[in-house]
């Protein structure tokens, strides 16, 4: 990821993040002073991408802990209660992305592991854990790049969907990590970027990131993918994930399932890149994944202007589920996992309680 920007960070007791709704035309920093501000940023997609919102939520827990420690005056039970409230608030904002609840659970459990702490001790431990989650995510993304680069053929043409780059993570990205690694190694590579309606994460964010890195790209509308596959222009598809369940089913941005079907029809490898924090083996298959439904206005409006007739109600599931049998391999920081996925995912995923 270019050193010119960070996705989310802690500064002077606040959570800072780039407002991704405004890119690429404006780079605005949002400063969150309370956990409610972080929840709002996640819900309104000022910050998005499963790993990134996990990092932001961890820092949101730190804001809640610091505020409660200031008010608690020795009452540790009060700070734990405030952390539980903060976790419930944050978890409710984007239910499909499991990194969110994983991060808040990890922070809360770490705080509860302290022996006879003061409120200050709890707040300090929560902030340290949030810093650790951010650093670990960045390291995992680099590892995904190292493992995944071997899957891209020489002079490879890669199709990606939505944004699974540095803006979706602590930095460097998941689906874009192998692409970045190939580019850093001096290997010629070209990326086909789905614009990704209705929020245009591909056109606005992925294209912007690739331009920062001077990686060649072609922007296409979502309904052009089959055309370029049939022409032989695509060597492989690499996407990110918001949740990978026990059998290998993958929840990701709406439209991912369609790409997987097209890739199978054209015998093109379909890879999913995600850190282990995205693996959720508590769910047996994709039918159990909660799918977030977002506002109809995000489909019928574009940049504040209506693009559909007044009164039209649009469906807007934010994610779909790609069955495991359409996935060629899953790239994690631990290595490349091939079917059958179940056993390897159990070993690779984080422990959840």
Swiss-Prot record:
<feature type="binding site">
    <location>
        <position position="94"/>
    </location>
    <ligand>
        <name>substrate</name>
    </ligand>
</feature>
<comment type="similarity">
    <text>Belongs to the eIF-2B alpha/beta/delta subunits family. MtnA subfamily.</text>
</comment>
<dbReference type="GO" id="GO:0046523">
    <property type="term" value="F:S-methyl-5-thioribose-1-phosphate isomerase activity"/>
</dbReference>
<keyword id="KW-0028">Amino-acid biosynthesis</keyword>
<feature type="active site" description="Proton donor">
    <location>
        <position position="242"/>
    </location>
</feature>
<feature type="site" description="Transition state stabilizer">
    <location>
        <position position="162"/>
    </location>
</feature>
<dbReference type="InterPro" id="IPR005251">
    <property type="entry name" value="IF-M1Pi"/>
</dbReference>
<protein>
    <recommendedName>
        <fullName>Methylthioribose-1-phosphate isomerase</fullName>
        <ecNumber>5.3.1.23</ecNumber>
    </recommendedName>
</protein>
<dbReference type="InterPro" id="IPR000649">
    <property type="entry name" value="IF-2B-related"/>
</dbReference>
<feature type="binding site">
    <location>
        <position position="201"/>
    </location>
    <ligand>
        <name>substrate</name>
    </ligand>
</feature>
<feature type="binding site">
    <location>
        <begin position="48"/>
        <end position="50"/>
    </location>
    <ligand>
        <name>substrate</name>
    </ligand>
</feature>
<comment type="pathway">
    <text>Amino-acid biosynthesis; L-methionine biosynthesis via salvage pathway; L-methionine from S-methyl-5-thio-alpha-D-ribose 1-phosphate: step 1/6.</text>
</comment>
<dbReference type="InterPro" id="IPR011559">
    <property type="entry name" value="Initiation_fac_2B_a/b/d"/>
</dbReference>
<dbReference type="InterPro" id="IPR027363">
    <property type="entry name" value="M1Pi_N"/>
</dbReference>
<dbReference type="Pfam" id="PF01008">
    <property type="entry name" value="IF-2B"/>
</dbReference>
<dbReference type="InterPro" id="IPR042529">
    <property type="entry name" value="IF_2B-like_C"/>
</dbReference>
<dbReference type="InterPro" id="IPR037171">
    <property type="entry name" value="NagB/RpiA_transferase-like"/>
</dbReference>
<comment type="function">
    <text>Catalyzes the interconversion of methylthioribose-1-phosphate (MTR-1-P) into methylthioribulose-1-phosphate (MTRu-1-P).</text>
</comment>
<dbReference type="GO" id="GO:0019509">
    <property type="term" value="P:L-methionine salvage from methylthioadenosine"/>
</dbReference>
<keyword id="KW-0486">Methionine biosynthesis</keyword>
<feature type="binding site">
    <location>
        <begin position="252"/>
        <end position="253"/>
    </location>
    <ligand>
        <name>substrate</name>
    </ligand>
</feature>
<keyword id="KW-0413">Isomerase</keyword>
